[in-house]
């Protein structure tokens, strides 16, 4: 008998700190939950705001369910389940997602769960239910030895990209294996051990799946524009006959254990700055102490007056950023504090500063006003997480998985709002003060003297990558297996439902007397407002000998106002549960704000004060310079940053400011004075080149009333933005190489100067690119380099134009020992793309690009981007209908014309950042002559 729970969840968020007398809006999350006879929990949530549905399958299995010697299996299945199932066939959900206009088809693995999620047009709901059922009941037979061998390589590439080939990548591994005992489920990393993964047999993998991927260990959530009664019928049809698995025994709660404090150090090949991390074992997810621990970490590091920031940043000037978080999982939790210090800073000094900050907190505790502001921010964050059907679906799935109750949100919020100052001090005393901890010192190579005194060396077994050492496999082999029986023919894909009508938001426009253009969309899905003011110019109006001025100007405008110190400004925003920030880009400076609708006027008043009444604080200016230099030093150690910066110079030329880092260079930042920032502000921050965009639960009249004073208070000035001409594509291809000794991956950037956003060919070229490298798993680059060869974790191609011409770029990180082979395969794909493009490719592209319009404007962020496209490029409010016509009228001949014109492999820049010792000479075989080495390695990196 199916069990059924119907709940209308009503949550009232009452926060006493709110400065307005308005009643806090009442949040309603309506859901219905049923449990099938086989144990599958299914949760339904109705949201009619857009004709889309989020589908999420969450299995209650993560790395914590693995055993020593067989790690990485949970994460491996996150990959495998997208590849094939008996009835969807090869390509599985990825191919279907492209056909039906799905968005965000993805998965993730944690210590405790694995989820599979995406948003689709509402007419594809039955197809998705059919596909999700195939994952649980008709999948595992399709996993064969060649499939497993290939996916092992993909996962290895993911680890190289996220761990081995990045600064501080091994830090968490060292922490967790010392924080948790050897037999603890959190002793190893989610991605697992490469050795365990390589040793995994097909039988090991199938045994793991059959134990954990069962209905009684899973939750299915359908959230969005659904007919619940019809959806129930489909759920029963496709899921009922999947057999129930064996009973799952819950893991017992088991905190980490540190018998005595331990200090370890590691000389990191990629680090340029020393990093100190300190970790304490704490409480698990939803434990009564976890809420106060969240507040503790937020208070200690958030804002100018936070104890760690006051001492480590302002007083001692040892760093520009302190990060602290309470990380709670199902079995245990940990409090983690990280400080990336300035160049050549001894971490003993940092630790002394940390101890001083703890002493200050112990003496003063957390003031009520700070507790109130943190709760206000939590309220805004809660609403933000519910701004999409996928966000709501994930919350419902998580609550059900961990508590058995999708409505646990009620208790969750109540516990959050019930935290007192006393609770915060209690958890500090219980988990932090005088308690044993793990400390790691990650220092640059040959920088052992910067580590904590007495630290012992952490031993990391690093992978050796040798040419030709990887296991061979043939991904083209068709799997042969016995089909799993069913009561009906599951190979027949369900039909579409009624065609949904895309809801294009209504856009309003206005203009102030000072030239400020205003664009808005009213949307009352959640009681939030998001807005930004985009001021044209950005880096483009800098001088070449003062690179970084725009970035520093934007940063300094956040640091107080004429009548408010930094602390007072931060406090005023925080009490509203709002945010206001400035950022600089290549073509503009952007002011962004997010607030509860009831606090919009108060929030905007603060943002206007930041914009019109800068404080120009000299002390803050010097701190920001140090932060920029610190970030630049760290970029020097990041292969991805190195690759992108070097590639930009090859695309645009060294004399074009578009080729330069927005942060500037270490030399240029050192030369900048506060007068340079004031000059930039006086000359370029003008409403004559600005546009304001507003989205949310607010009317046009309220917005215009809120900014009418800007006509008088923000005077227009004439601003001339220099024109930098983008070079033409090269006449022939050249290979460029940037040496990163001992790199486990090579960063590839292949491309050429291309189109501006407003060029007539820009959008058609993007349509052409969908099947090449813009369509994720539907693209040929992904299918051949990742799925076919296992060379990479990810690869994409894109056109990136602004008001001036941009570039076409293929980007990827590939296993070091296949740098040449990956490049040759990309060259071959490009050479044959136009010629081999067929009706099936065209149908796939059209199907996705048209059907995906149903969810093009679902989120507030998407609506803001729509307004920015309209204001920045002069597009019509219904420009999506014009684009839809372009897609519908696209032909194979037009695709071939665009491919021949814009993605010619013989007229491109082929850039590689990797290990020159093993890969440079091999690149001659690509056929574009002798590679050009762009740098000489100054310091050999240890083996």
Annotated model-derived regions:
Residues 155-162, 254-267, 374-385, 593-596, ...:
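Short, conserved secondary-structure transition motifs
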Residues 7-14:
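Bacterial N-terminal signal peptides
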Residues 133-143, 238-246, 355-366, 610-616, ...:
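A common structural junction motif
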Residues 145, 152, 206-237, 436, ...:
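Non-catalytic, conformational "gating/processing" segments within enzyme and secreted inhibitor domains
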């Amino acid at each position: 008998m199916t069990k059924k729970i119907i709940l209308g969840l009503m949550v009232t968020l009452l926060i006493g700190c709110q400065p307005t007398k308005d009643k806090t809006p009442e949040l309603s999350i309506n859901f219905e939950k049923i449990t099938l006879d086989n144990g599958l929990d299914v949760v339904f949530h109705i949201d009619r705001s857009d004709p889309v549905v989020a589908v999420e399958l969450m299995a209650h299995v993560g790395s914590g369910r693995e055993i020593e010697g067989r790690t990485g299996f949970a994460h491996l299945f996150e990959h495998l389940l997208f590849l094939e199932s008996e009835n969807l066939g090869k390509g599985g959900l990825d191919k279907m997602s492209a056909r039906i206009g799905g968005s965000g088809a993805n998965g993730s693995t944690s210590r405790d769960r694995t989820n599979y999620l995406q948003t689709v047009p509402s007419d594809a709901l039955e197809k998705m239910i059919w596909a999700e059922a195939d994952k649980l009941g008709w999948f595992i037979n399709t996993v064969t030895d060649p499939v497993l061998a290939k996916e092992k390589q993909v996962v290895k590439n993911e680890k190289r990209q996220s761990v081995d080939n990045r600064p501080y990548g091994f830090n968490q591994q060292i922490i967790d294996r010392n924080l948790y005992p050897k037999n603890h489920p959190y002793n190893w990393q989610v991605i697992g051990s490469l050795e365990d993964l390589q040793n995994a047999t097909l039988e090991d993998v199938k045994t793991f799946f059959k134990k954990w991927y069962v209905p009684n260990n899973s939750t299915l959530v359908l959230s969005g524009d659904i007919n619940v009664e019809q959806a129930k019928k489909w759920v029963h049809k496709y899921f009922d006959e999947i057999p129930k698995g064996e009973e799952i025994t819950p893991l017992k709660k088991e905190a980490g254990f540190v018998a005595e404090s331990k200090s370890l150090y590691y000389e990191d090949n990629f680090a340029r700055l020393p990093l100190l991390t300190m970790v304490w074992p704490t409480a698990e997810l939803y434990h009564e102490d976890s809420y106060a621990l969240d507040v503790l970490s937020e208070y200690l590091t958030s804002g100018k007056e936070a104890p760690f920031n006051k001492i480590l940043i302002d007083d001692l000037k040892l760093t520009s950023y302190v990060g602290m978080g309470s990380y709670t999982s199902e079995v245990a939790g940990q409090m983690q504090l990280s400080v990336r210090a300035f160049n050549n800073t001894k971490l003993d000094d940092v630790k002394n500063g940390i101890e001083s900050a703890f002493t200050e907190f112990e003496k003063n505790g957390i003031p009520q006003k700070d507790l109130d502001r943190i709760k206000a921010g939590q309220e805004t964050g809660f609403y933000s997480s519910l701004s999409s059907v996928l966000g709501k679906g994930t919350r419902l799935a998580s609550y059900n998985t961990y508590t058995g109750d999708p409505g646990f949100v009620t208790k969750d919020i109540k516990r959050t709002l019930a935290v007192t100052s006393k609770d915060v001090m209690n958890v500090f005393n219980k988990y932090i003060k005088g308690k044993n901890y793990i400390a790691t010192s990650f220092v640059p190579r040959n920088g052992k003297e910067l580590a904590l005194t007495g630290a012992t060396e952490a031993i990391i077994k690093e992978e050796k990558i040798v040419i030709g050492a990887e296991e061979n496999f043939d991904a083209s082999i068709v799997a042969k297996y016995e089909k799993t029986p069913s009561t009906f023919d599951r190979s027949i894909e369900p039909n579409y439902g009624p065609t949904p009508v895309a809801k294009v938001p209504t856009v309003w426009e206005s203009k102030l007397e000072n030239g400020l253009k205003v664009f808005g969309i009213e949307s009352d899905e959640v009681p939030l407002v998001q807005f930004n003011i985009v001021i044209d110019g950005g880096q483009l109006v800098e001088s070449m000998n003062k690179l970084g001025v725009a970035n520093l100007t934007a940063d300094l405008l956040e640091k107080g106002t004429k009548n408010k110190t930094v602390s007072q400004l931060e406090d005023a925003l925080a009490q509203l549960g709002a945010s206001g920030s400035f950022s600089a880009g290549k073509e503009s400076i952007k002011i962004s704000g997010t607030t509860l609708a009831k606090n919009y006027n108060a929030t905007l008043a603060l943002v206007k004060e930041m914009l019109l009444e800068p404080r120009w604080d000299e002390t803050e200016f010097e701190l920001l310079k140090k932060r920029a230099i610190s970030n630049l030093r760290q970029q020097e150690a990041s292969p991805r940053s190195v690759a992108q910066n070097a590639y930009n110079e090859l695309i645009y030329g060294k004399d074009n400011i578009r080729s330069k880092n927005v942060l500037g260079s270490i030399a240029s930042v050192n030369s900048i004075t506060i007068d340079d920032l004031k000059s930039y502000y006086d000359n370029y921050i003008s409403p004559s080149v600005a546009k304001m965009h507003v989205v949310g639960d607010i009317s046009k009249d309220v917005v215009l009333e809120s900014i009418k004073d800007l006509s008088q208070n923000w005077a227009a000035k004439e601003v001339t933005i220099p024109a930098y001409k983008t070079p033409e594509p090269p006449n022939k291809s050249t290979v460029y190489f940037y040496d990163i000794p001992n790199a486990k991956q090579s960063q590839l950037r292949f491309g050429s100067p291309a189109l501006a956003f407003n060029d007539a060919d820009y959008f058609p070229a993007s349509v052409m690119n969908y099947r090449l490298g813009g369509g994720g798993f539907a693209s040929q680059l992904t299918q051949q380099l990742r799925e076919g060869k296992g060379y990479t974790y990810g690869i994409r191609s894109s056109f990136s134009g602004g008001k001036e011409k941009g570039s076409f770029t293929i980007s990827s990180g590939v296993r070091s020992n296949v740098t040449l082979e990956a490049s040759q395969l990309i060259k071959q794909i490009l050479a044959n793309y136009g010629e081999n493009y067929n009706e099936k490719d065209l149908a796939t592209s059209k199907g996705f690009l048209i059907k995906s319009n149903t969810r093009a404007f679902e989120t507030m962020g998407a609506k803001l981007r729509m307004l920015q496209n309209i204001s920045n490029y002069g597009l019509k409010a219904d420009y999506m209908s014009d684009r839809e016509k372009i897609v519908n009228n696209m032909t194979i001949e037009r695709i071939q014309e665009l491919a021949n014109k814009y993605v010619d492999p013989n007229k491109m820049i082929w850039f590689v950042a990797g290990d020159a010792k093993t890969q440079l000479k091999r690149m001659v075989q690509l056929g574009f002559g002798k590679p050009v080495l762009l740098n000489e390695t100054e310091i050999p990196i240890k083996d």
